[in-house]
Amino acid sequence: MDPGVSSHLRTASLDEARRLPELERVLKSGWLIKKGHATSTKKQLWAVLRRDQLSFYKDEKEYKTKFIFPTQDISAVAYYKEKSPKTFFLYLNEKIIRLIATSNEDAEEWVHVLRSTTGYRAPFSRHPISYILANSSSRTESEPNVQISDTDFDNISTEPRNQTTSPLDLETGQGDHFCTSLYDLIQFGKLRPPGINEENANYPFNPQEVNTLNKHRHSASLQNLYKLLDENKVLMQGTIHWLHGNLHRWSKCWAVVRGYGMTIYNTNREYKPVKVIPIADIQDVAEINVPESSHKYFFTVITQNKPIEFRVDNEDSLILWVAALKTSIDKANGTFTAC
């Protein structure tokens, strides 16, 4: 075997050996009651949280697992302390799990540990230049397009437009569209242009070959994003639907996300807000997965008192709304700071 290859394999084995103990380390364990959809259905199980998964056993002997939830599948944790101090909810990819702890203090500890371990916290791409899917030549005039810019906020709209994209000039950054550093908030490859398969999306896009990706007119650095948050400038805005009222009806509205929270207006004139959700009142944000065939995309803003559900038109918008809100939460909690 080539000495270089042998050395590489030994290094990889050592890295894996160091990683395994960390994955096996128990972050928290204890009894939890898992409640089903029916009020009478509940099971007391022994729960064990490790870095990569939350496991449930019949008892503390941990002989056989009853349920396993990978931590990467837990997108948010909801805890309504005033209403139900022992109860918290896990938002998973396809369902919501209700859990009841043995005491108020135990519930708070579970929530704290889970939030520090699970869900995505607006990860950043290591690619030196930030890109985003700004537009696609395959769109039609009737399809809405969300334009985002951290400098020309008046240009942000969801109005239909009919423009074609042009190849990007890497030296000047010129192109038909501009995009925000919000791309840095989402897992690399989650947004990708039509025609790019998932395997190719795992690598940085080549802007010379993919004309739908455009360089930001200014640096999309973390410092720039931190400034946007610090000055409460617009991170995301557009037309969405929200579920509200005693009859739980869907209403079309104009929403704006800034560092201090989310504001909802009747129209994009932003004359008078109909609802303001301060960032301090938002626990977390979660995507709600529904069958892909339904062509509907939802996310929930989990406030201190209740969840508020929103609907958007496409998956790209869904990712950006969630990313903008997640980052505002991270800034408020001190998780996200300028590098």
UniProtKB/Swiss-Prot annotation:
CDD domains: PH1_PH_fungal, PH2_PH_fungal. InterPro entries: PH-like_dom_sf (IPR011993), PH_domain (IPR001849), PI-Interact_SigTrans_Reg (IPR051707). Residues 25-119, 233-330 form the PH domain. Disruption phenotype: Leads to off-center septation. Does not affect its3 localization to the cell membrane. The keyword Repeat applies. It is a peripheral membrane protein. Keywords: Cell membrane, Membrane, Repeat. One of its GO terms (molecular function) is phosphatidylinositol-4,5-bisphosphate sensor activity. Binds phosphatidylinositol 4,5-bisphosphate (PtdIns(4,5)P2/PIP2) at the cell membrane. PANTHER family: DUAL ADAPTER FOR PHOSPHOTYROSINE AND 3-PHOSPHOTYROSINE AND 3-PHOSPHOINOSITIDE, TANDEM PH DOMAIN CONTAINING PROTEIN. This is Pleckstrin homology domain protein opy1.
